[in-house]
């Protein structure tokens, strides 16, 4: 399982990439955005030393998230991405090609704690 922590200005969230019943899912929540539709995109680099300006070009479109009128998005998406290939890359939340927030995708503590992850 992989995890990405988003913490940029007032935009915060946790996004997990995990196998659920044999399929890879993207799960989590994000707060602090205005209501509307936003894109989750994986970028080439996990370098956030200059915020979202240093994460490189977009590589994989994960899907769209929908933020409700309270500024909350609940994420539950299917993905074909191989989780092991995205470790160390960045995930951005974007709208109209503008990167609003981003974070680095890392190995989740649950992997180390349990050696495997199972969804019950």
From Swiss-Prot:
It comes from the Viruses. GO terms for cellular component: host cell cytoplasm; virion component. Keywords: Disulfide bond, Host cytoplasm, Virion. One of its GO terms (molecular function) is copper ion binding. Gene3D superfamilies: Superoxide dismutase, copper/zinc binding domain. It is found in: Virion; Host cytoplasm. Disulfide bonds join 52-102. Its main location: virion. Coiled coil: none annotated. The keyword Protease does not apply. GO terms for biological process: superoxide metabolic process. Superoxide dismutase-like protein with no enzymatic activity. PANTHER family: SUPEROXIDE DISMUTASE CU-ZN -RELATED (PTHR10003). Belongs to the Cu-Zn superoxide dismutase family. This is Cu-Zn superoxide dismutase-like protein OPG175.
């Amino acid at each position: 399982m992989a995890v990405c922590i988003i913490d940029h200005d007032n935009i915060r969230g946790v996004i997990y990439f995990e196998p659920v019943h044999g399929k890879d899912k993207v799960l989590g929540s994000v707060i602090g955005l205005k209501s509307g539709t936003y894109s989750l995109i994986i970028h080439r680099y996990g370098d956030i030393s200059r915020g979202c300006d240093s994460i490189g070009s977009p590589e994989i479109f994960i899907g769209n998230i929908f933020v409700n009128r309270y500024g909350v998005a609940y994420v539950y998406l299917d993905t074909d991405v191989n989780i092991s290939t995205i470790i160390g890359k960045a995930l951005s939340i974007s709208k109209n090609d503008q990167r609003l927030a981003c974070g680095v995708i890392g190995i989740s503590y649950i992997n180390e704690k349990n050696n495997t992850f199972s969804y019950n």
